[in-house]
């Protein structure tokens, strides 16, 4: 069996190596010629899987995408050819949730304010949006949810997008990218909606770049410096609008979901599904793939301080490092060839490929001899909190 896998997908050899020959490929430049002899195709969001890509293949038995979203997959075509497909819903939800939470803590520190006491609106209450809400609610932050696609069958309380933008001090976007329908999300935040944001709004996008009209965002930010931006996704990836970057407080190259746990979870979910398709028992465990937990003795009595919580979060992941690398890579004049977007030269994709996958809060095992109520730290995701 020939297994074609994105070169940036971890643990493929450990999980799929017994099944056949594995060939690692560049997912963004994958061609029909490369795919023609594959029995299994494992991709990420940078690969568009459609009739054109699969036109030379008559042997494909399975397509798996280690992603939450599926807008890069022509599922109708796969179904018409009888090719089983699965993605990995929720695989990196915890990573995205913690990324957004840490970004909010960083903004609070930078602008000498407190996250606790603000109202946070979450647009899109699926796996990733719910993970953000989980962190915020564990910390005691008021959360508003907007998701017209699920609210009819979901017991949680929802508000309209208009009500959310009127009330929320912070807005975090977690929707799939859809171009059609009553609830399309392409340019959901267009020039008018951006202009109508309340003063001093923090706007975070960790889903798809085109959910915000980036050209309009440049225009609005020039007029409204009070709006603070955190962008992990960009219109036109892997060539973001470089003129937007200086307007962004925290800028990263679509790596919000890049935790070691999240990446392992995504690959493992594809492994489980393929084994089911093949009728073979999945006898490998995900926990065996991951390094052991870190241990850290901390004074939990100090953690009610938001700055102390930020320091603990930075021990797991310091978002400022990725922001600095992003700016250095894409805006460093010495790296820009005349007449070319620097993303083409040293780029966006290279940062993603070489990203050192961070750990999630659960990788940090805390211990304390103090008497503080620490249940909220367990709810936030940290491991082994005890006395």
Curated annotation (Swiss-Prot):
Subcellular location: Cytoplasm
Pathway linked to the protein: Cofactor biosynthesis; pyridoxine 5'-phosphate biosynthesis; pyridoxine 5'-phosphate from D-erythrose 4-phosphate: step 2/5
One GO-annotated biological process of the protein: pyridoxine biosynthetic process
This protein's record includes keyword Protease: no
Main subcellular location of this protein, as a coarse class: cytoplasm
Lineage: superkingdom: Bacteria
Active site per database record: 208, 237, 254 (proton donor)
GO cellular component, as recorded: cytosol
Coiled-coil segments on the chain, per record: none
Residue pairs linked by disulfide bridges in the UniProt entry: none
EC number(s) on file: 1.1.1.290
Class in the EC hierarchy, top level: oxidoreductase
Cell division keyword on record: no
UniProt binding sites for NAD(+): 147, 232, 257
Function summary: Catalyzes the oxidation of erythronate-4-phosphate to 3-hydroxy-2-oxo-4-phosphonooxybutanoate.
Quaternary structure note: Homodimer.
Protein name per its UniProtKB record: Erythronate-4-phosphate dehydrogenase
Gene label: pdxB
